[in-house]
Amino acid sequence: MPSFDIVSEIDAVELRNAVENSTRELASRFDFRNVDASFELKEETVKLAAEDDFQLGQMMDILRGNLAKRGVDARAMKAKDSVHIGKNWYKEAEFKQGLEALLAKKIVKLIKDAKIKVQASIQGDKVRVTGKKRDDLQEVMAMLREANLEQPLQYNNFRE
């Protein structure tokens, strides 16, 4: 029986490249001359630091632009509120890996409500979809692309 997995993953290399490109762009921008501002990547969290809250907003725009250039979906990023400590402002942007249980249940419900002849099962941080026909599986993929979910999805492990 044909099957595939629905996952939500981020390419760590592309994320690192986007952060490094953002740092380079920050150094070359005129409005950030003589300003103490930086991007710092630790695992799947990017920490932004600047002297003003307004500058943090500009830095988030720079980061989003570089993520788009590198092919990383910005919907996977969850930005926390700005924090003022001392003379600097800080903001953290966390990148979600894997499907949370609530989102996985929502995906399974969408598939079942579509009345397509496939079975969907939650397996850890992914959803496995199996069906008798390859066309049914492709229909599920198209339906999920159309659905407006809060996290980007990838389809892998396609088996005949």
Swiss-Prot record:
Stored InterPro entries: DUF520, UPF0234-like_C, UPF0234_N, YajQ-like_sf
Gene Ontology MF terms: nucleotide binding
Gene Ontology CC terms, in alphabetical order: cytosol
One Pfam family, short name: DUF520
Matches recorded under CDD domains: YajQ_like (cd11740)
Gene3D superfamilies hit by this protein: 3.30.70.860, YajQ-like, domain 2
Domain of life: Bacteria
Keyword terms of this UniProt record: Nucleotide-binding
PANTHER family recorded: UPF0234 PROTEIN YAJQ
Family, per entry: Belongs to the YajQ family.
Function of the protein: Nucleotide-binding protein.
HAMAP family with a match to the protein in the record: YajQ
Protein name: Nucleotide-binding protein VC_1508
